[in-house]
Amino acid sequence: MIKITFPDGNFREYEAGITGWDIAGSISPRLQQDVLAAGVNGQVWDLHRQINEDAEVKLFKWDDAEGKHAFWHSSAHLMAEALEELYPGIKFGIGPAIENGFYYDVDPGEGISIKDADLPAIEKRMQDLAARKETIIRRDIAKADALRMFGDKDDQYKVELISELADGTITTYTQGGFTDLCRGPHLPNTGYIKAIKLLSVAGAYWRGDEKRKQLTRIYGISFPKKKMLDEYLELLEEAKKRDHRKIGKELELFAFSQNVGAGLPLWLPRGTQLRLRLEDFLKQIQKHFGYQQVITPHIGNKNLYITSGHYAKYGQDSFRPINTPQEGEEFMLKPMNCPHHCEIFKITPHSYRDLPIRLAEFGTVYRYEQSGELHGLTRVRGFTQDDAHLFCRPDQLKEEFCKVMDIIFIIFKALDFKNFEAQISLRDKVNREKYIGSEENWERAERAIIEACEEKGLPAVIEYGEAAFYGPKLDFMVKDALGRRWQLGTIQVDYNLPERFDLEYTGEDNKKHRPVMIHRAPFGSMERFVAVLIEHTAGKFPLWLTPDQVVVLPVSERFNEYAHRVAKELNQRDIRVQVDDRNEKVGRKIRDNELKRIPYMLIVGENESREEEVSVRKQGEGDMGIMKITTFAELIEKEVDDMISAWRKDYQN
């Protein structure tokens, strides 16, 4: 008998060779119907894979990320099976599950192309194959046999992948007449897949290398129920309306120019207003929490990034070194701000009394993203991080972690991100050799993160083995208005850079000690955060943040002078106002400015100019009546002050 322990600490004994499917059935028929994969000692397994020794087991359903991953991974294989039947001789690259669905990179063959118009036929074949409920079979085979199998099919992409694997056992999965190289896990059979939609076709270079062949990437989504697919497609339509690229253009927030370069956004005046207000917002909070603002160059000596290890990590994703007239001197566009902050820390000797030291910077960094990976503001080549690095004593770690969490909570509340969750990434329970830093420091850091979450009442999922080699971390995932998950805000403990840069402080014992370093970026990057904020709010930003709070609309040209006088009076009270004095009918002006998401419209005509008043319309609410200019100004000032005081109160308590 073997002992199976469940997440709640309870356990049961089973015969050796039991499977996740059998365990689910022993608990309840409904669970067996819903379960998609099994977690066995921290690894995700197929449901029919045998468990032969004591294990910690967790059963994953659709609502679990691991369940969706297995479902969508099997859907990618189902698509590949359909493609192989429809396009004999097709070759396969990789076909993973992704955050929302799956894709497969394929090579249809010389002179053959797969277009969007072909997707319905592929979809239909997938549905037919799914209806057969083909069993998905996992096999372990020798590397030589795998090379021979895929070599006989002349599938050079799979042969290349297999050749790079270590000698030993290779895992394949078979369903019907289709076999693929894969680690898994997968569903028990194709019949679980009830609803399928292939979404788009794109190009993708083999292994992300622009010098290699461009393959055809087919994206899809699938669900266990048709109703789920219908809801998802409705969500997609709403997401298209909220696309930050579309709204950013409509609101004149940012743009791109091929003359400047792909992936290098240009912030237009209205977008710059928005971004600067976000930066000022965070600077105010950071000032309260004792941060010091710093500025570092956009470039650094290549040796700096060799010391930090970033050159080895980002070398392939960086722009080429900048050579100077001096022989042997090379500079790099900055891929990260942390090496520069380490150098700032080193400039001045520090005592234990000086710590913690908190250095903050809105620092622009550069990484070369392939053209096919660029996407609006979410994937760019130059972006600004709201970076800060804290240098503290080990005994200060928990307190500093809590304070950073407070900053993130204030930001989420102020910007109406009400639904968020967290993940704590800790070391592997068994394999500890790859981690830098002492056992004592790691235990202290991991305990500090867990206790900080408990003290703040933050529910957090603990993931073992997900920590970076240099320290544990806490990631925040927010749900936007459409229910999509975005990673915003990371707090990372680092024992690596203090070692690499030989950072030290003098302790109470008069000896030299290494500080603990904490990386944190609540926004992540300004570009990506603004993109998420646009899509979350559909461009209807909070009144304190929006670039233009008010627009004045004269009903005809003869009231332009009065409209500009109203705007001047509001401007003098720091209210952000524009005048729309185009020679258009007022109805057209109202419609146009509603599309610009400007919160308040002030309509001025004969009566308003004579009485020194304005007719007020509020975005989404309509007519608010006629007011004196000063009355309206006081109204908008109070609305803004109430918003700002709400989040100021959070950090001043």
UniProtKB/Swiss-Prot annotation:
Cited Pfam families: HGTP_anticodon, TGS, tRNA-synt_2b, tRNA_SAD
Catalytic: annotated segments: 243-542
Catalytic function, reaction form: tRNA(Thr) + L-threonine + ATP = L-threonyl-tRNA(Thr) + AMP + diphosphate + H(+)
Cofactors (names): Zn(2+)
Biological-process GO terms, alphabetical: threonyl-tRNA aminoacylation
InterPro entries tied to this protein: aa-tRNA-synt_IIb, aa-tRNA-synth_II, aa-tRNA-synth_II/BPL/LPL, Anticodon-bd, Anticodon-bd_dom_sf, Beta-grasp_dom_sf, TGS, TGS-like
Stretches assigned to coiled coil: none
EC number: 6.1.1.3
Amino-acid positions noted as binding Zn(2+) in the UniProt annotation, renumbered to this chain: C338, H389, H519
GO molecular function annotations of the record: ATP binding; metal ion binding; threonine-tRNA ligase activity; tRNA binding
Cofactor descriptive note: Binds 1 zinc ion per subunit.
Role, per record: Catalyzes the attachment of threonine to tRNA(Thr) in a two-step reaction: L-threonine is first activated by ATP to form Thr-AMP and then transferred to the acceptor end of tRNA(Thr). Also edits incorrectly charged L-seryl-tRNA(Thr).
Family membership noted in the UniProt record: Belongs to the class-II aminoacyl-tRNA synthetase family.
UniProt subunit comment: Homodimer.
Name of the protein in its database record: Threonine--tRNA ligase
Organism ancestry: Bacteria, Pseudomonadati, Bacteroidota, Bacteroidia, Bacteroidales
Gene coding for it: thrS
